[in-house]
Amino acid sequence: MAQCAIADGITHVVATPHSNSRFHFDFVRVRELRDELQAAVGDKLNLATGCDFHLDPENLDSLRKDASHYCINQRNYLLVEFNEISIPPSMDQTLHEIQLTGVRPIITHPERNGILRAHPERLKKWVRQGCFVQVTGGSLAGNFGPRAQKDALQWIGEGLVHFVASDAHNTRTRTLQLQPAYAAVMAQFGVEKAQALFLENPLAAFEGRELPHVPEVEDELPPPRRKRFFFF
């Protein structure tokens, strides 16, 4: 996967294993593996750790004790993943409580979550509350179907999206590759937006800085003209 990233021109990678009831997040072991890989790749990649954090009670208790273990590069941005069975109304308060600790939630791949696709007003509320949103590069490239692609592009246009990430899982079907997604965003929104989502905001989160690009959330925009989708 590291070789895939280097070939794609990627310079910074955050390894984000799941942290939930099924997958135990062992911070010490994750850091050991990160250090081993960093030594192997040298200065070709800058590697950090984080996790895809599920908001279950046990996880939240651990977060209160030491949030840095779970955050990107042990700074203050946290990747948050929702399940597709239910997102309780209390989630508004849960996200707010996380923010009060100084942690900045980044909601991951909402364009692939059926609940949030059906109720994008919830996503908009959280963004207006100060949360951030990350969509998957594969969604923008059409790899997760036309609905995920459509919603991801529309939400970028509405100012809901702050990051694009690979969400890579392997070297075959979900690889560390972002060039097709970058081309898609640049074709529809221009180079400035592409740089913000793929380079400038991600680097700021990596370093624990304020995001340089936080667009104002717009009301729902009309769908783009059909011809704009055919850029492959």
Where are these regions (language model features)?
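An N-terminally biased module of ancient metal coordination in phosphate/nucleic-acid-related enzymes
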Residues: 1-44
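Non-catalytic positions within long, well-ordered alpha-helices that form the structural scaffold/packing
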Residues: 6, 99, 156-157
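Divalent metal-coordination and catalytic microenvironments
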Residues: 17, 47, 109, 167, ...
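Active-site environment of divalent metal-dependent phosphoester hydrolases
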Residues: 20-23, 54-57, 112-116, 140-143, ...
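Short acidic, glycine/proline-enriched helix-loop-strand junctions
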Residues: 23-32, 41-46, 173-199
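Extended substrate/RNA-proximal surfaces in nucleic-acid metabolism proteins
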Residues: 26-134, 212, 217-232
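Short acidic/histidine-rich active-site segments
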Residues: 158-176
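Mid-to-C-terminal alpha-helical segments outside catalytic/metal-binding sites
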Residues: 183-232
